[in-house]
């Protein structure tokens, strides 16, 4: 288990020795009430083998819906409106 603590949030990464999948749990410290699953604070994330090429392709496709340059990540939106996180 890895953990990242900041002033705004805590992230815990859970994994095992059987696969290379990782579960990321995020707690936003300033969230005003208990989490409700209907808030859509969940999503899938994918690690790109070539982040720059993936970003270029997604930009050409006009499917980038949010970008956080400080964290080095961005999100694309699928045809059903779900956000997918792209990691380097």
What annotation goes with each model-predicted range?
Residues 27-31, 88:
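Acetyl-CoA-dependent GNAT
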Residues 5, 30, 70:
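Residues that form or immediately flank small-molecule/cofactor binding pockets and catalytic motifs
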Residues 1-22:
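Core segments of cupin and vicinal oxygen chelate
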Residues 3, 13-15, 33-36, 65-66:
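Short secondary-structure boundary/capping segments
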Residues 10-13, 52-88:
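Vicinal oxygen chelate
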Residues 39-43:
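Eukaryotic phosphotyrosine signaling hubs
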């Amino acid at each position: 288990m890895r953990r990242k603590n900041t002033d705004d949030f805590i992230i815990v990464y859970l994994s095992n020795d059987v696969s290379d999948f990782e579960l990321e749990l995020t707690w936003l410290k300033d969230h005003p009430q208990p989490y409700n699953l209907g808030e859509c604070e969940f999503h899938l994330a994918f690690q790109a083998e070539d982040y720059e090429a993936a970003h270029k392709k997604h930009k050409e496709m006009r499917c980038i819906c949010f970008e956080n340059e400080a964290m080095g990540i961005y999100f694309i939106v699928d045809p059903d409106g779900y956000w997918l996180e792209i990691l380097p």
